[in-house]
Design a protein with these regions (language model features):
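Amphipathic, Lys/Arg-enriched alpha-helical "gate/interface" segment within cytosolic domains
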Residues: 2-133
Length: 133
């Protein structure tokens, strides 16, 4: 299988500890809502076109997760949920975690998705390639 690069520069699929996953780099956007939303939409289209089920980790470090950004994130997740067995999120504040978890549970297609929050991307990737939820 050949490696491709996503709009954000991530290799697809990304090999890690004997497994494969996909990483979205949505960090370092600061308060630039338009920038992070634009990247999200481009990554969504890319991921759907790959037609492959992979654990997904998303880096939100140094990006302000406004209500609008979180809403767009939930919408993106609903569109790609059939391709994601597990979701690891990195760089979310306590309040961001609370908001995201609440909205994921409200979503019919996302409520059963295994989601974990991490401070370290390596921990997120290790969990995603493990057999355990």
């Amino acid at each position: 299988m050949s490696l491709k690069k996503s709009p954000g520069g991530s290799y697809f699929p990304y090999s890690y500890k004997g497994g494969e996953l996909f990483g979205l780099h949505l960090g370092s956007f600061g308060t630039n809502e338009e920038g992070v939303i634009s990247r999200m939409k481009a990554e969504e289209v890319f991921f759907i076109r790959q037609n492959q089920s992979l654990g997904l980790w998303i880096d939100f470090c140094q990006t302000k997760l406004t209500d609008r950004v979180i809403g767009e994130f939930i919408e993106m997740m609903e569109h790609i949920s059939s391709h994601i067995p597990k979701l690891g999120l990195v760089g979310c504040s306590f309040m961001d975690r609370w908001k995201i978890t609440r909205l994921l549970k409200k979503s019919e297609c996302l409520s059963a998705l295994p989601v974990r929050y991490f401070n370290d991307p390596e921990d997120a990737k290790t969990w995603l390639v493990s057999e355990y939820n």
